[in-house]
Amino acid sequence: MKGKKRHILMVNLPYAGHTNPSLGLVRCLVAAGHEVDYIQAEAFRERVEASGARFVPYDEPPQSLVPALNEVRNWGAAYRTVRRIGANYDCLIYELLFFPGKALAAELGIPCYRLISTFALNRHLLRMLGQT
């Protein structure tokens, strides 16, 4: 339906190279009158809010003293947050590395769109990503 304002859920993992490129899209969606809620780690709150989206922190963010362990646990925290609130949205926009995005959107009964912020891709990688 053309002109209908949507309530959009975005989710990303806490990597600047993946998050920063998505913020331009957020600004465009907000400027078009859509409401965007963005699930992200606390370190990105300021950037997300500056884009016009409502910041939604991960459920139970990881608290390990080992940075690599926190990175792995961020995936689970992002997943749990989407699963808890995702059905309340018109669609899910998720980033390349959030592999459960498509299956999670199907489970929630909402359409989804995958962002790819990486520029150097080949056919093999694109084919592999198309299967997730």
Give the predicted meaning of each segment.
Residues 1-132:
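Glycosyltransferase specificity loop/lid
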